[in-house]
Amino acid sequence: MTYSVRLSPRAARDYKKLEASIKLEVQAGLDVLQDHPLSGPKIKRLKGRLHDYWRYRVGDYRIVYAVDQPARAVYVEYLQHRKDVYRAA
């Protein structure tokens, strides 16, 4: 069963700013999250103040998201370079 992927306004803005080649990789990552948002080699649950979120690695970029299992939805909050993403969160 697939999940719907929804971008926050911040994540949508970050997505628009990406270079075309990175956009393709990120889009492939978002497609993976539709089918398997909670398990996989590039997926990890975050700790500390972000304990309700998960992250998916896409090269040097990170997709930080929350999962609503009853609604079958993935809410992408942040989509940024790894050096910036945890500062923004």
List the predicted regions and their residue ranges:
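Enriched for short, Lys/Arg-rich terminal
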Residues: 1-24, 57-61, 66-89
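A short, surface-exposed loop/turn module that caps and links secondary-structure elements
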Residues: 31-56
